[in-house]
C-alpha cells in the first residue's frame, strides 16, 4: 500500500521518480514486475490523480505530473502528455518529451515524431533513442515523414550504438538521393556506433564524395573508428 498522497508525490518528482526507476530496474525487463509497481499507485488512487494533474493550472504541477507518469509507465497518460508538447512553459514541454521517451510504445513515439518541428533535433534524437523499439526505428528509417524526421532517426541509431544499423547507415551515407544533412547524420552515427566494418565505406566518402560536408563528417567518423593512434592524412 502506498503511504503518500498525490500532493506529496508531486512535490518530490525527482526523488519519487528515482525510487520508481530503481524499483523497475530490480523488477527486471518483464511486464510483471512493472505492473506490480504501478499497481501500488493505481490501487491507492494516486495514478489517477497524477493524470488529472497533467491539466493543472500550475506549470510546476503539470511538469511534475508528466515526469511521474513517465517514470511509472502510465500508458493511459500518453494522450494527455502529448498535449503538453505544445505547452507555453518550456519546463513542461521538456518534461513531456522526457516522459514520452520513458513511456515508449507506438503512441508515444508517434507523439514525439508528430512534434518533430517543435522539438530540437538533438533533444528529439535522444528521446527517440531511449523510447523507440527496433521495429519503430526500422519503420521510421523506411518511411520518414520529413528530412528532419529522417535526420533524427539516423542520429538515434548512433546514440543507441545499434550495430545492426551499420549497413543501412552506410547505404544512406553513400546514397546522394538523400538530403545532405541526413547523409551527414549517417556518418556521425557510424562514428558513434564504432563498428570497424564501416571503415572502408567511410574512407571512400572521405576521399571521393563531392560534398565538403559529407567528406568532413566521413573523415571525422573514420578517425573515430581508427582511434587516436592513426590520423587520416589531410
Name each model feature, range by range.
Residues 1-26:
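Acidic, Ser/Thr-rich low-complexity segments on the non-lumenal side of membrane proteins
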Residues 7, 17-21, 34, 38-54, ...:
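Amphipathic alpha-helical scaffolding segments comprising HEAT/armadillo-like alpha-solenoid repeats
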Residues 17, 34, 62, 93, ...:
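Residue-level detector of extended alpha-helical repeat arrays and alpha-solenoid scaffolds
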Residues 27-28, 69, 73, 100, ...:
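Alpha-solenoid repeat junctions
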Residues 59, 69, 183-207, 211:
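Extended alpha-helical scaffolding segments
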Residues 59-73, 88-98:
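Membrane-embedded segments
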Residues 66, 82, 96-97, 113, ...:
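Hydrophobic core positions within HEAT/HEAT-like alpha-solenoid repeats
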